[in-house]
């Protein structure tokens, strides 16, 4: 007796991808079940170099999905990463690939996780192309991701490249159940983000200015900041406290911080329970070591008694 599709799916869900590929060749019925599982989670990594400058895997995937539209609703997780070395030529050709992704990705309305890391795709000066961020070429028509819970957007940045526009704000405003957000290359605040947007957001990773524009009015309890410790100042730090729930977890391990920032954090964020810090002592080693210990103890005394974990990664 043939097993029902539900039973086959339950069995196939526990098999590795390599086995599913083999089973997909056994019969049309096995193929139908195995394909849906294989396409439920897509992870594409393109390594770009002077000898291979095109994100071919990404382009092949776009064409494959156009040939298999019945599998689009099966995809729950989509990750696309482009990695490049210094020998890679100027990425003008990547604009067309971003435009192609902008035609395909919006069709994945059942997505729960979206991770786009486009490497050098945005390393174009504004006068060479339309003033739109490379990632915005993909997300500008993504207005129906009602199930998206996790979103990560990033690309390499330098001076003179196309900045984010209100397309990003419109995209974020269309995500009613988003809980986890990472904006790794956004150095400014998100402009014109409606106050009612992202009502369920619980964690954010990005620059201090971006955090200061996103956290107010939202239930964020997990915050991870990137950049330089000087980017955290008395303008943006107070605004990070305007969350609807107290901040509990703060991760500063992506930046080397000085002791004075700990003092400011203890003043503005007394509800922090877990703090990850990469403490840069090289700025203070010309003082006596006992003085450093004394200052650090004084600063830590300001911190809330709610701390249950406190990690220091010392940079000498």
Please provide the spans of the model-predicted regions.
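Low-complexity proline/serine/threonine-rich segments in eukaryotic and viral proteins
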Residues: 20, 144-149, 174-176, 244-248, ...
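"… SH3/SAM/PH, and C2H2 zinc fingers" -> "… SH3/SAM/PH, FHA domains, and C2H2 zinc fingers"
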Residues: 7-12, 19, 28-30, 59, ...
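Leucine-rich solenoid repeat modules
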Residues: 6-14, 264-316
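Long alpha-helical scaffolds
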Residues: 34, 105, 265-269
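Hydrophobic regular-secondary-structure patch
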Residues: 2-95, 119, 123-125, 206, ...
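Leucine-rich repeat
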Residues: 52-63, 84-245
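Long, well-ordered mid-to-C-terminal structural blocks that present hydrophobic/aromatic surfaces
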Residues: 234-287
């Amino acid at each position: 007796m043939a097993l029902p599709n539900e039973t086959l799916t339950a069995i196939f869900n526990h098999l590795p991808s390599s086995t599913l590929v083999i089973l997909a060749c056994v019969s049309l019925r096995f193929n139908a079940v195995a394909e849906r599982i294989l396409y439920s989670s897509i992870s594409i990594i393109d390594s770009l170099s002077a000898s291979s400058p095109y994100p071919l895997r990404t382009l092949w995937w776009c064409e494959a999905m156009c040939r298999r539209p019945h599998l689009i609703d099966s995809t729950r997780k989509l990750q696309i990463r482009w990695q490049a070395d210094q020998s890679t030529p100027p990425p003008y050709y990547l604009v067309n690939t971003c435009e192609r992704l902008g035609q395909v990705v919006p069709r994945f309305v059942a997505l729960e996780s979206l991770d786009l890391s486009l490497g050098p795709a945005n390393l174009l000066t504004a006068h060479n192309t339309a003033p739109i961020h490379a990632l915005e070429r993909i997300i500008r028509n993504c207005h129906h991701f009602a199930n998206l819970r996790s979103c990560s957007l990033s690309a390499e940045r330098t001076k003179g490249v196309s900045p984010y526009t209100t397309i990003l704000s419109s995209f974020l405003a269309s995500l009613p159940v988003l809980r986890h957000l990472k904006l790794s290359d956004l150095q400014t605040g998100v402009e014109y983000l409606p106050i009612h947007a992202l009502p369920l957001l619980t964690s954010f990773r990005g620059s201090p200015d971006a955090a200061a524009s996103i956290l107010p009015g939202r239930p964020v309890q997990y915050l991870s900041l990137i950049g330089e410790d000087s980017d955290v100042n008395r303008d943006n730090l107070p605004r990070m406290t305007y969350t609807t729930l107290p901040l509990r977890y703060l991760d500063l391990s992506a930046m080397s911080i000085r002791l004075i920032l700990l003092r400011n954090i203890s003043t503005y964020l007394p509800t922090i329970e877990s703090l990850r810090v990469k403490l840069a002592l090289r700025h203070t080693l010309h003082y006596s070591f006992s003085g450093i210990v004394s200052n650090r103890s004084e600063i830590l005394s300001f911190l809330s008694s709610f701390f249950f974990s406190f990690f220091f990664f010392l940079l000498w």
